[in-house]
Structure formats: structure tokens, C-alpha cells
């Protein structure tokens, strides 16, 4: 394989942060699947794997190289968190939609805020029967105010989950769990 050389304007270093068990590693695996780097998604939300060290996942998409840094969620690995944050230009904070607002989420938001790292929040596991998107959104807004502004909202809840609605561009994506694919509606 020939290694491609990228201009620095076409490289993005993005940290994946969140509370332990929120689905950070599964999110990266899903991104690899979407980019065609994996033939299937093997992660299971019931898996109890713990990320204990930084891992780098390079994904090329539409001419840009995205270096996703999977950062541990346990406070025991704070040195790894510090190292990961020093290397990123932006962050995706993964929030578990089946729980209340967690310490790991709050820590990720505070750490990225203190370093002026641009970030967005991804509410994960919203297709789970225990998920409550509105509750977690309300908790985030209560704690962080108007800085929490959804671009996408869940379409349905629990077993009635159908997909997400893009409230900026006004379209919906419906998820077919049986085929593991989305379609714009």
C-alpha cells in the first residue's frame, strides 16, 4: 500500500470523549463502517469493554483525513485524556441516552471548554428501549444553558424510534434496523 500525503488543511484530529460505557469505541467503529473501512459493525451496546489507552483511527472521507482519537472515559486514565486532548482540534462528546447526565460527560465538556476545543455532543443509544432523548437534552440544557442547541433530534422513543430529524436543514433520516441502513425521507 502506498501512503498518501495530505496537506495539513485536509487533516482533522478529533477526540472522541465521554463517560465510560457511553459507546465511544462503537461510535468510531460505526464511522469506519460508514467510510467503507469495515465490512460490518461488530460492537454491541451490552459489551463491557473499557478503553484504557488512547487509540487512533484514521479515516479518509471525501478527500479529508480524519484522525479520530478514542480517549478513555474512566478518570483513572486521566494522563491518557490529557495526552489525547493535546493532540486534537475538535471533539465529539458521546452521551449515553439511556442514563442521566454523567460525571464523565460533565468532565469531557469542562475539559474541552477549558482548552477552547470546539465540540459537539452526540446522544448515543437512542434506539434503546430505555433511551430518553428529551430527558438527557433537558439535563444538558439545565446545566449548560443556551450553548446546548440540537442540530438533530430523535424521531421516536424506545421501540418507536424511527431515526432523526435534522432541524437545521429540515429533513429526516429513517433507520431500518433490519438492514442497518438509513434513508432520507
Positions of predicted regions on the chain:
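P-loop NTPase catalytic nucleotide-binding module
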Residues: 1-22, 41, 96-185
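P-loop NTPase switch module centered on the Walker A-proximal segment
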Residues: 2-101, 144, 150
Amino acid at each position: 500500500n502506498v501512503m498518501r500525503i495530505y496537506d495539513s488543511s485536509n487533516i482533522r484530529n478529533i477526540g472522541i470523549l465521554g463517560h465510560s460505557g457511553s459507546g465511544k469505541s462503537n461510535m468510531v467503529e460505526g464511522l469506519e463502517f460508514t467510510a467503507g473501512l469495515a465490512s460490518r459493525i461488530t460492537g454491541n451496546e451490552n459489551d463491557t469493554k473499557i478503553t484504557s489507552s488512547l487509540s487512533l483511527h484514521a479515516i479518509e472521507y471525501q478527500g479529508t483525513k480524519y484522525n479520530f482519537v478514542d480517549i478513555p472515559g474512566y478518570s483513572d486514565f486521566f494522563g491518557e485524556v490529557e495526552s489525547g486532548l493535546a493532540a486534537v482540534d475538535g471533539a465529539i462528546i458521546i452521551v449515553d441516552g439511556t442514563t442521566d447526565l454523567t460525571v464523565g460527560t460533565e468532565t469531557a465538556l469542562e475539559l474541552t471548554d477549558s482548552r477552547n476545543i470546539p465540540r459537539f455532543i452526540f446522544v448515543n443509544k437512542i434506539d434503546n428501549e430505555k433511551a430518553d432523548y428529551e430527558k438527557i437534552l433537558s439535563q444538558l440544557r439545565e446545566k449548560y444553558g443556551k450553548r446546548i442547541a440540537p442540530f438533530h433530534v430523535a424521531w421516536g422513543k424506545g421501540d418507536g424510534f424511527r431515526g432523526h430529524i435534522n432541524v437545521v436543514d429540515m429533513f429526516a433520516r429513517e433507520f431500518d434496523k433490519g438492514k442497518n441502513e438509513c434513508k432520507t425521507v
